[in-house]
From Swiss-Prot:
Transmembrane segments: none annotated. One of the early assembly proteins it binds 23S rRNA. One of the proteins that surrounds the polypeptide exit tunnel on the outside of the ribosome. Forms the main docking site for trigger factor binding to the ribosome. It comes from Fusobacterium nucleatum subsp. nucleatum (strain ATCC 25586 / DSM 15643 / BCRC 10681 / CIP 101130 / JCM 8532 / KCTC 2640 / LMG 13131 / VPI 4355). This is Large ribosomal subunit protein uL23. Keywords: Ribonucleoprotein, Ribosomal protein, RNA-binding, rRNA-binding.
């Protein structure tokens, strides 16, 4: 997998902004089959920073109803990446 295929987009919410400011942790939506080692290498290659720790969260698809029709939401995987103290990532909130 290419490093740009692993990291899909940053997740920007109030909770992730709190993690970023207080603990220097950044949250990304990643490819569902990516592991922690691949995520670490991808973040280090794309943003040129040193990664200390990676935690992943798998979100299973949820069955929803729209009228009589049932459908499933898409499964997602998020990675919370902790950077070294001297490193930061700047990204646009429009991404």
């Amino acid at each position: 997998m290419n490093v740009y295929d692993i990291i899909k987009k940053p997740v920007v919410t109030e909770k992730t902004e709190l993690l970023r400011k207080e603990y220097n942790k950044y949250t990304f939506e990643v490819h569902p089959k990516a592991n922690k080692i691949e995520i670490k290498k991808a973040v280090e290659a794309i943003f040129n920073v040193k990664v200390e720790d990676v935690a992943t969260i798998n979100k299973k698809p949820i069955t929803k109803r729209h009228g009589m029709r049932l459908y499933k939401t898409q499964a997602k995987k998020k990675a919370i990446v902790k950077l070294a103290k001297e490193n930061t990532i700047t990204y646009s909130k429009e991404v």
